[in-house]
Regions:
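Extracytoplasmic/periplasmic ligand-binding sensor regions of membrane-associated signaling proteins
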Residues: 115-122, 128-202
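Solvent-exposed, extracytoplasmic
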Residues: 103-114, 198-235, 239-240
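Cytosolic-side ends of inner-membrane transmembrane helices, especially those
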Residues: 15, 28-33, 301, 305, ...
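Extracellular/periplasmic ligand-binding regions of membrane signal-transduction receptors
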Residues: 48, 52, 59, 63-105, ...
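Extreme N-terminal signal-anchor transmembrane helix of membrane signaling/transducer proteins, especially
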Residues: 2-45
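Short, hydrophobic beta-strand elements of compact beta-sandwich sensory domains
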Residues: 181-184, 195-205, 262-302, 306
Length: 372
């Protein structure tokens, strides 16, 4: 056996090194399991807090937009002007372009809902062939084009939230034209129950961005807001992230809790929160490499420190055993170089204790021989 060929000190040395190595890996493994559980729990709590706070802020914003649409819906001045516009409506002609007094009355009422500070980006009332809003009035052809695109379909019975889109009626630069719209059907409740158009309450993307960009970028956590079709509401116009988040939302399904997302293309941990007043979901997501990064760094430092201590202890044991064995080596050389004429047989020795006994007997004989 190999162990029989090793000296006693070498056996102690190897056993000590193996025990130290096993201890270090056991400590690192235990620490990894404990740290993973703690990080998972911390991530769950943090994801829940971030997604809940963001969803509540978005819900308040949507409630405010809907409150304004209800106020517009019930305004008597607007109702009267819309009734007159409906009664005197001519196909292909924007009534409010031909009647500036009526336009001013409606715009004055609209401004009252958006002052003294700018609460929302824009307010508009849209007919299939008429339009009036706080901004400039586009041509009837443009209104018809937008209307016929089916932009205002799929009503839920009360109001509809459109995902982020570019306002076709805005006059500002492209980066400032991105809006989120709340649409509510409007009828002349004071005159008839006939639907006469759509109230559009627009909120700028900057407001959505302000809500969604607060206090979530920790260890590369990513926050998304998606609509019922999986389209990205925030961040806007990022094709790569849109494709990625559609895969994430498919993995989440309808679950309202934390989910380990794992596939060939994307893997990580995340949580989603469904808004109570809109078909939007807030998703907080973190990839595996970012979630496991702090854990691996901690374990790596444990292994580095433990490896350094192991090397130090191995060297200490090595030199200590070497120092202890030096007298035995000296004794062996002394006995072997003596003139007693007796050859020592070390073949049957199993341990260094046996060797020491043999050397001691030989040394005693050598001393006796010298005396004689």
């Amino acid at each position: 056996k190999i162990s029989d060929r090793l000296s006693y000190s070498k056996r102690i040395f190897i056993v000590f090194a193996l025990l130290c190595s096993v201890s270090i890996f056991l400590v690192a493994g235990t620490y990894y399991v404990r740290l993973y559980a703690d990080n998972r729990k911390l991530a769950q709590n943090e994801f829940k807090d971030i997604s809940t706070r963001t969803a509540q802020a978005l819900e308040r914003e949507i409630d405010m937009m809907d409150m304004i649409s209800c106020q517009i819906f019930g305004n008597k001045k607007i109702q009267k002007e819309l009734f007159d516009a409906t009664e005197n409506r001519k196909k292909g002609v924007n009534y409010f372009e031909q009647n500036p007094d009526a336009r001013n009355n409606v715009q004055e009422a609209l401004w009252s809902f958006n002052s003294p500070r700018k609460v929302v980006a824009n307010l508009s009332i849209i007919y299939p062939d008429m339009f009036i809003g706080l901004l400039e009035i586009p041509g009837v052809e443009e209104v018809n084009r937008i209307w016929n695109q089916g932009l205002y379909e799929n009503w839920d019975g009360y109001y509809k939230i459109l995902p982020t889109h570019e306002d076709p009626f805005a006059i500002s630069e492209k980066k400032d034209r991105v809006t989120v719209s709340l649409l509510r059907k409007m009828n002349l409740s004071f005159y008839s129950q006939k639907d006469v158009g759509v109230i559009e309450v627009q909120q700028s993307y900057e407001k959505i961005e302000e809500i969604c960009s607060q206090n979530y970028d920790r260890n590369n956590m990513q926050l998304y807001v998606v609509d019922e079709d999986g389209n990205i509401v925030y961040p806007y116009e990022d094709t790569k992230k849109t494709r990625e988040m559609k895969r994430v939302t498919e993995t989440f399904g309808s679950q309202q809790c934390d989910v380990i997302v794992s596939s060939k293309e994307i893997s990580g941990i995340g949580m989603q929160h469904q808004l109570s007043n809109a078909p939007w979901k807030v998703i907080v997501f973190q990839r595996d490499k970012d979630f496991f990064g702090p854990i691996f760094r901690s374990v790596r430092w444990i292994l580095i420190f433990g490896g350094g201590m192991l090397i130090f202890m191995i060297l200490a044991v090595f030199f200590a055993t070497k120092r202890i064995m030096n007298p035995i080596v000296t004794l062996r050389k002394t006995v072997e170089n003596s003139d007693t004429g007796e050859a020592l047989d070390f073949s049957d020795l199993k341990t260094e204790i046996d060797e020491i006994d043999l050397l001691q007997r030989a040394f005693t004989k050598m001393v006796k021989h010298i005396r004689e």
